[in-house]
């Protein structure tokens, strides 16, 4: 006898690299930072900054979400990451007195409505006809709210680690999420791009 397929009530989506395109958004933020410093950024300049960002993210341990010491300092290190990006840009391209303006432009632009991953909006719209959709993401609350603004109407809840007081994949994140939803784990399906950081 064929086993009956599990019926989910909630589909819980990670945000970056699942629903929204962080890489495209970060490149846009680099261009805005250079513009705020009075520079016309070449593609090579943007790519160099993007490569540094990825390297610095790893060096700060922000990929190591299973380590207790990282979990305790994740949001602090996120701010450090942004400062080190701007320091790199200043070192390489001499932002000078416009360094502060560049940093503000970078952060403000990264908090703008994000580029959706190809096909995401259409897929989410279709799924919202049958399921309740939620977001579960690590990041800064104000930034993620801005980035998700054009898709927000599709989600019943948006859970951001800074507001939750704990990051994924800590069990406490999911326990608090389930409590807020007043549901159980067997009624939810988590959808993301990383087995190590999303579940």
Where are these regions (language model features)?
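Core-facing hydrophobic residues within beta-strands of well-ordered domains
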Residues: 8, 154-155, 185
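Substrate-recognition element of Asp-dependent hydrolases with the DxDx(T/V) motif
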Residues: 98-115, 120-150, 158-161
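Short hydrophobic segments within beta-strands
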Residues: 14-15, 136, 191
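N-terminal helical cap/lid subdomain that shapes the substrate entry/recognition surface
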Residues: 5-118
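Receiver (REC) domain switch/active-site residues of two-component response regulators
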Residues: 16, 156-157
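Conserved Lys-Pro-Asp/Glu-containing loop-to-beta segment of HAD-superfamily phosphomonoesterases
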Residues: 167-199
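Catalytic P-loop NTPase motifs of RecA-like helicase/translocase cores
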Residues: 19-21, 143, 197-198
């Amino acid at each position: 006898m064929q086993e009956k397929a599990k019926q989910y009530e909630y589909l819980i989506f990670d945000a970056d690299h699942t629903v929204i395109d962080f890489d495209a958004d970060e490149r846009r933020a680099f261009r805005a930072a250079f513009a705020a410093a009075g520079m016309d950024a070449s593609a090579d300049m943007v790519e160099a900054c993007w490569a540094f960002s990825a390297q610095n993210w790893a060096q700060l341990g922000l990929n190591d979400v299973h380590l207790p010491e990282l979990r305790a300092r994740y949001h602090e290190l996120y701010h450090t990451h942004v400062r080190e990006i701007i320091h790199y840009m200043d070192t390489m391209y001499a932002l000078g007195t416009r360094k502060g303006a560049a940093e503000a432009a970078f952060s403000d632009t990264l908090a703008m409505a994000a580029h959706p991953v190809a096909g995401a909006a259409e897929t989410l719209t279709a799924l919202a006809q049958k399921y309740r959709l939620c977001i579960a993401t690590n990041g800064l609350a104000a930034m993620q709210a801005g980035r998700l603004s054009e898709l927000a109407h599709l989600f019943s809840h948006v859970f951001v680690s800074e507001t939750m007081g704990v990051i994924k994949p800590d069990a406490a994140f999911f326990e608090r999420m389930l409590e807020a939803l007043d549901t159980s784990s067997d009624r939810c399906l988590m959808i993301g791009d990383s087995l190590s950081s999303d579940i």
